[in-house]
Design a protein with these regions (language model features):
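Basic/aromatic-rich interaction segments and small domains that mediate binding to polyanionic partners
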Residues: 2-60
Length: 60
């Protein structure tokens, strides 16, 4: 599990704009199932935010 402020690389993401990019987690939410976490990652360009799950993130 990651936390707000963590530096990450986005991997295996279906959106080409996000895949392979680096950024910082700016917010997170827990899904209704109580197990899945959704992370908003602001890319280093400070213009783009990508929605990701655990499997799509890797610690920098």
């Amino acid at each position: 599990m990651f936390s707000v402020g963590s530096r990450v690389q986005i991997i295996n993401h279906s959106e080409p704009l996000c895949n392979g990019q680096y950024g910082t987690i700016v917010s997170m939410q827990v899904a209704y199932d109580g197990y899945t976490y959704y992370y908003a990652v602001e890319l280093d360009d400070s213009l783009t935010t990508c929605s990701c799950i655990d499997d799509e993130l890797m610690e920098e």
